């Protein structure tokens, strides 16, 4: 990066070459209701002598909500149209009910370090990340906490092993990641009575007590993800069986101070797109709608997911296209003590993946969910996939 603006025989303009450093600047919006900005820098040769990874990043996002008038207007207009057979004619346009006094803002920074290990073998890697996030809420009804500011200081440690033979279409090998994220146990030394804090939502002190209770978020978060790839036929274009298993648990140091953030948002395509919040980890489960397994009031503090997937490549190389068919199951629980990896919501389906060098990985899946989720069956669902999945 130090030669970003220097010119020589091999380097013209502001396009750096050489050490694989990455500088990323990004912005995303859907118009009025969501904006996101991020910047990051990473290198695989920190210090210039050994293959040590280093990264630093920061981000800011804001999501707003609609005013209560939207729901009232929608109800009365739909009732009027039902009686007289009229259409809405745009009277309930979502954009017309933007409420700047209902929002959740997130600001975060992170510092990361990683190193390849030589034991047990050369495929292992150790990664450590120190991160800070500040949540700023105003009249936000999708969390246990609706108003105020909250802080999250955490340390993540992960060990991964990757031995696949191809990044775009693996035929053999495996991928495993085990991680733990820890915050300081603030409740162990602040001498506060969390059992009797913010328990009565009708109290005039409820919001103030919420702010006091969640000023510093505390939790311990455990995750495991694993994939294996097995070639069932010979040759470059071969039939491949992919198996997947993953699970996560979000625990608390104090049972009266469960974290309202960093829960699991389970169901659907698994992309971290528009949802009721951006302080959740998005987990896909095809055959069910986005977040349908963890609706408001039933936040996910534990989840599991298992998959069997058959893949066959139609085109290999810089542009890769392959089809797939799959069986999948998973579930989510709002209490870690109720975690049962064999109580799954099942689905099956087919799909296709396309990798284009200038675009990245894209996909489309059709899946059918066989089981009921909160009284409704999953049924037929289409899922759009953008980006590489673990």
Regions of interest found by a model, annotated:
Residues 1, 138-316, 320, 325-326, ...:
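C-terminal outer-membrane beta-barrel translocator/porin domains of Gram-negative envelope proteins
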Residues 1-170, 174-176, 286, 297, ...:
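Gram-negative/organellar outer-membrane beta-barrel architecture
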Residues 38, 42, 160, 223-227, ...:
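Short, well-ordered alpha-helical packing segments
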């Amino acid at each position: 990066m130090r030669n970003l603006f220097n010119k020589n025989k091999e380097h013209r303009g502001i396009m750096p070459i050489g050490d694989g450093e990455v500088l990323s600047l990004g912005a995303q919006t859907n118009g009025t209701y969501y904006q996101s900005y991020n910047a990051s820098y990473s290198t695989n040769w920190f210090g210039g002598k050994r293959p040590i990874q280093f990264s630093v990043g920061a981000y800011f996002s804001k999501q707003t909500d609609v005013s209560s008038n939207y729901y009232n207007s929608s109800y009365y207009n739909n009732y009027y149209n039902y009686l007289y057979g009229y259409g809405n004619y745009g009277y309930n346009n979502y954009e017309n009910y933007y409420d700047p006094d209902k929002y959740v803002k997130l600001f975060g920074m992170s510092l990361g370090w990683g190193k390849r290990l030589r034991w047990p073998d050369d495929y292992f890697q150790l990664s450590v990340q120190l991160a800070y996030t500040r949540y700023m809420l105003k009249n936000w009804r999708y969390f246990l906490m609706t108003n105020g500011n909250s802080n999250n200081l955490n340390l993540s440690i992960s060990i991964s092993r990757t031995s696949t033979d191809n990044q775009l279409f693996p035929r053999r090998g495996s991928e495993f990641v085990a991680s733990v994220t820890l915050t300081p146990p603030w409740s162990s030394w602040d001498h506060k009575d969390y059992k009797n804090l913010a328990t009565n939502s009708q109290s005039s002190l409820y919001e103030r007590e919420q702010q006091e209770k969640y000023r510093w978020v505390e939790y311990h978060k455990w995750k495991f993800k694993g994939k294996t790839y097995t070639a069932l036929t010979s040759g470059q274009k071969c039939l491949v069986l992919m198996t997947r298993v993953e699970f996560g648990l979000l625990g608390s140091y104090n049972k009266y101070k469960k974290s309202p953030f960093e829960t699991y948002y389970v169901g659907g395509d698994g992309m971290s797109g528009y949802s009721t919040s951006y302080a959740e980890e998005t987990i896909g489960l095809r055959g069910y709608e986005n977040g349908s397994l963890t609706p408001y009031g039933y936040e996910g503090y534990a989840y599991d997911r298992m998959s069997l997937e058959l893949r066959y490549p139609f085109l290999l190389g810089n542009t890769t296209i392959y089809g797939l068919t799959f069986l999948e199951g998973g579930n989510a629980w709002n209490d870690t003590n109720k975690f049962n990896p064999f109580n799954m919501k099942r689905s099956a389906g087919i799909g296709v993946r396309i990798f284009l060098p200038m675009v990245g990985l894209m996909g489309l899946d059709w899946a059918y969910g066989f089981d009921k989720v909160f009284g409704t069956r999953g049924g037929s669902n289409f899922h759009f996939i953008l980006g590489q999945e673990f």
